[in-house]
Amino acid sequence: MHEVIICEKPKASEKIAKALSRNTVKNSYKKVPYYEFEENGKKTTVVSAVGHLYSLSPTNSKQDKIFDIDWVPLYDKDKKKKYVKNYVDAIKKLSKGADKFVHACDYDIEGTVIGYNALKYACGEDSIDKATRMKFSTLTKEDIVKAYENPIPIDFHQVDSGIARHVLDFLFGVNISKYLTDSVRETTSRYVQLSAGRVQTPTLSILVEREKEIKNFKPIPYWLIKAALEDDIIADHKAGKIFERKEADGILAECKNADAVVADITLRENKRTPPVPFDLGSLQSEAYGVFGFSPKRTQQIAQNLYTEGYTSYPRTSSQKLPKSIGYDKILKSLSKNAEFKKHVDALKKPLKPNEGKKTDEAHPAIHPTGTLPKGLDTNEQKLYELIVYRFISVFAEDALQESMKTKLNINSQEFSFSRKRMVKMGWLEHYPFRKIEDEKFPDIKEGDTLKVNEILCEEKETKPPARYNQASLIRELEKRGLGTKSTRANIISILYDRKYIEGQKIQVNELGEHLIDTLKEYSEDITSEELTRKFETELEEIMADKITKDSVIEEAKVGLSSILDDIDKNKSKIGEKLYEAYQESRIVGQCKCGGNLVMKYSYRTKGTFVGCSAYPKCKVTYPIPRGTNVLKTKCEKCGLPMISFGKPRQRACLDPKCGRNGKESTNEVVGICPQCGEQLIKRMGRYGEFIGCSGFPKCRFTKSVEEQEAK
């Protein structure tokens, strides 16, 4: 009897093999590790994929509309993936003659497709009939053994849904991108690689919509009236924003030389319930707000923590913690860490988590497994502690906060101020990532007279809608039903890679904006949220066995064909507009000679650089190292654009000879050091601008400008 277990990643195969037997032997084939053990006359081989081994590819790339596609080995399609061949060869060799197969890839859509394709194409189609499925949410020994001893059938509806998603994304992305690129090439004889996608383009459309709201926004002046009183009290006039200067002047006149009389004091005790457990979206949002991690980075770190067995499966929508995960056991294990123990010991029995409404049939909310980590890097440690403290805090008591709202009369004008103080810290003692409002209450009572030191009148303007950051865009996509928990971060990353968007506070550049404007004018369906949402619903219906994979794909081909026909009818207009936008997007500034500084590509060095549009009359050039972004921010010294580069991201002037790149400090105070409490200031170093502690060299805390701006 020979059994083959197919895992998703090498680390997972090691964990699973060692959990199932003490007699596991590690071997390798073509440098691919695999594990074997024999028990009770059964030989078991544990081998892994390395993520996706197969990818969709056109059967005939010369087709006008690419609808005929098939799965091919990833190494045949992408030269950078040659290493994948060894994994495919290893699975083929080790699975020959096997009597039984176990699909042990991650229990989600992607993991299901990875394992299914490995079985179908590497092991042979007959392997599918001999295969069962392991379902686990952590890579702990207990969960692995339980999943192995209680296998389930492969869910072929989940397989079909996953394959349909891949097919839809491929058909829309490849065809629309091809048609847009061809429209520019056939109109201008220039090659410009343009990209569009089933979810990517509606996402970009949301950002363009916000960009237009900001550009078209007309600020309206207004006035705020405040009273500065004794005991450092600042009270606000009840009118709030006042849009007529005459009204503001009338209030100021009436308050002149008058004291404030306490008219009413309202005290309330407010309960602050513990936070709910993390699902992937809320973890990404919290990590962005606390640490400045991009959603994609958070997802990568969380996946690493899961693979190492320290936390549960991250790609979950659940905010539920079922009893079956073993609260007591996890907390007891965490208590082996002295810092965690203080918080665990303070929890009161019986343990009952404060859960959210969201559920996920496949996995519980993200939680620590209880296995204490070793050798984590700084960012992994940060995210691990965030997950641990969140887990502990959901079992803690409510926090109680007392609020004091005081109404004041200054002559006939009503003002008010509010204060908050903590009565009981509750869960806030266990979750150090929340702001705590704990203010001093003034010793006053109704009827008291307070001295007015000054009546302030602040002139302000209404502000446009805020730009999205990566975390708020993830929330917006989730709210609108676009993408999935697993794909949203990658969609945003693609928009950055395509140079359609830039900055921590996301700004759409000229090419991205013109692309959406052009598509909306000539083929609006491409940008449609409704179309994308419709297919998301149908993909879920495939999983629920309400509709077939083939019917959804055929329906998509009909709709896509209509979109492509619209592009084809307006090819010359679309090509001209997109090429013009592309040319504008390449301009990064103005040269001293009066020409434009534009991004250029060197066929000799196979890299980009900035050069003058007046070449060969003007031969000014600036190097652009790989991984560098040219920003819209201008150098304060020479006026050239700033660039962003390196990890962590640093800033410097485009001109490497500019004096701004020296080591002088700007001394701009940007915050408080979290380690020592001194001021954080902008500094200039060898590699550009960064944030450092003013307490240097005693305190060596630093971070990038981008991390600071993300706050």
Q: How would you describe each model-predicted region?
A:
Residues M1-V174:
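Intrinsically disordered, low-complexity regulatory segments
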Residues P10-S13, A17, K43, K81-V88, ...:
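Amphipathic alpha-helical transducer elements in NTP-driven molecular machines
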